[in-house]
Amino acid sequence: MQNEYVDMNSSSEDSDGDSILEEGRLRPSFRGQQKERDMLGIFGEEDEDGFHNSGIGSARLRRKNISFVEKSEQVKANKQVTADDLLEAHSIPQLKNKNDEVSQAKNIPKMKFNTTGFGAKMLEKMGYKQGQGLGANAEGIAEPVQSKLRPERVGLGAVRERTEKQRKEAIARGEISDSEDEKHTVKQKPLREKKKKPLKSSEEISKDMGSYNLPRFLASLIDASLNDTKEIEFVTSNKEELGLEGRDMSTSGINQLSRLARVECEHHASAWQQLQARRAYVKMELKRVTTEFDEKSVEISRLEKLLGKVMEVKSRSMEFTVPEAEIDVIEKRLQPLNNLIETLPVEFSEASMHFELDSVAVSILAFVLSEPIKNWDVWKHPYFMLESFLSWKNSLYSKDFRPKREESSTFMDIDVEFDDELEGQSLTHYESFMMFVWKKKIGEELKKWIIQDSLKALQLLEAWDPVVPEKVKDSLIQDDILPRLKDAVSKWNPKLKLKKNDSLHHCIFPWLPYLEKHADSLLQSVLVQFSLILSPWKIKNGSIDDFSVWRSAFANDALDRLLEKVILPKLEKLMDEELVIDPSNQDLEIFFIILSWKGSFKAMVFGQLFADHFFPKWLETLYQWLTEAPNFDEASEWYTWWKSVFPKDLLSNAYIQQGFSKGLDMMNECLENKSITAPLPFAKDSTKGVNLQFSKEKHEFTAESDDTTSYDEPLVSFRELVEEFCAENSLLFVPLRRSHLSTGSALFRISTQASKARGITVYLRNDIIWKKSPGASEDTPYDPIGFNEILLMFNNN
């Protein structure tokens, strides 16, 4: 098709153009074109100049005059041009298929180098020559950069996207061939060639199978497929029947038959190897079972031997059940039993023997000794079978009686450490025997024991102490001894003391060394009982027991604090209210009652008592005597008499000496006719001044003596001590916000958790912890409890 160029500004042939437009109504209005384009979308057929051939929504064409720059042949020939001719001349023909599109893309003119333009002239001035590359050394591109334009309405893949230059470069690089289309340029991985497995000959297969020999005909078939084999030999009894047919067998048939034989032979070889491996395993397993059978047979024979010894001991056990048998006779009959227990680890010491010899020995002892121990008179024969028990303990605690254990292959013998920990937590067989046989008997006898006669019980327990394990001893103390001693402490009443040996310390002190760590619990009960007795105690009844003996038993001056809090205020009140200093008729009953408590307090505390409450009265009486009608002889005798009344150990007290020195100074001032310094007036409200007067002297005395106490310093409250105790032992001390019904004391709960369902309810009174019994009502009297008992209670729970 030949295209013609039209000049829109030409005015020639206007009449012809108008007639053509009016006749054919070629172009629709702009609005109609836009409307129809929106409706048809991509399905509309429109040429590049906007001409539309569809009859849908056709509108009136423009009537502007059109003139042609170069007239067509029909116009030159003065022919009439119709609308169809104009559309045919200026519209793009419809492409029927993709090949037409490709052919159209090939007809697009190629870009050429313009040799007459301004750019070409500038390049020529800079030394560029056509056909060479750019740059000083002509190393740049030699051709212009080309652009590839896809035709309109043509998708990807319809035409080649590369330019001709890019295709040449790709062919030069080897990416595509000259005749290869671009859509087939995807690289493909080369297929992996399978390596052929080398064929084995019959000899190699027979060698792999070990002692198995291939039949001759199979070996011939296998070797037939090898390269150097050209013939096959048939081993058959009827060779004539084969004839020429067997000789003329083709090579392909031979190879196929050989492959079948080879596959079958390889299957046989694999099965043969499996059978050989199974055979070796069966031999090894048979050897293991045989060895294990022999070991078990030896173990069974030794077990039967051990059982025979046990039955022998059982048959002779009737000798120990005779009640008329004497102690010496029974101990002699125990000698074979001792020999048996000593020889057990010797006869059964093999590492393969997993017998628990200690369990066997303890079972024998429990069976044989149950009746003799049941009939044992503990108090009459306290050392019955003691030597035998000592021998049994040494034997059972030796390593020979422990079960034999194979050496562990674990790192650093971790399992051994675990076993040691378990041994520390559980009872051994010997400990179980002593717990349920010996402890049971001793516990029953201790229930009949009189608490005041501690010597027999202590002799019995101390004699058996080397034999009794520590766990059994602790259980005996907690279950049988401590309850009896605490019961005696709670029932102790100093008013009912009839004999000297009825003192509480005569019953308790002998047990303290044996109790060891449990002694604190007992002393706490004693301290509670002292508090219960001293609180209502009347001073005029005299001193209670010998507190100086008890002071050394308590740690942290617990007894001294109790006496200073309960008894000392009563002594001060008695001295202030009832002690009268009368030189004419002196009554010393109150004075001696106060002196009876001298051993209960420390020397400095008791001296402070006289300095604060006795000497103010005594000095006031001496001052009045010397100032009114002085009689130096009588005053001197009265002074000397009072010094003789004081015991010598108390007279050497620094406070007592200071008081008498002040009286002597007053008499010397009177003899020298000097003005006598009046002592501070004594009154109930003036005791503070008296304390201030002697405060400086007190500090001087404390520097001289090592046995001093800071009595004036405030003590820590008992509640603070209880709270500190609970905090140190991870216990909660929680106030309940209610009080006890009878005493009015605040109630608290001591527990390990915040739950109300756990713990004990207590109240504090007179430095004592009072505990509510489990399940008791609110009006039930509370029981005293010590710190150690609280710990034991929560540890057991």
UniProtKB/Swiss-Prot annotation:
The UniProt regions of compositional bias labelled Basic and acidic residues, in chain numbering, are: 159-185
Task: Write one Pfam family the protein is assigned to.
Answer: GCFC
For molecular function, the Gene Ontology terms on record are: RNA binding
Segments carrying the region annotation (Disordered) are 1-33, 159-204
Which keywords are on file for this protein?
A: Cytoplasm, Cytoskeleton
Would you tell me the Gene Ontology cellular component terms?
A: cytoplasm; nucleus; post-mRNA release spliceosomal complex; spindle pole body; spliceosomal complex; U2-type post-mRNA release spliceosomal complex
Know the name of this protein?
A: G-patch domain-containing protein C1486.03
Please tell me where this protein is predominantly located.
cytoplasm
What does UniProt list as this organism's lineage?
A: Eukaryota, Fungi, Dikarya, Ascomycota, Taphrinomycotina
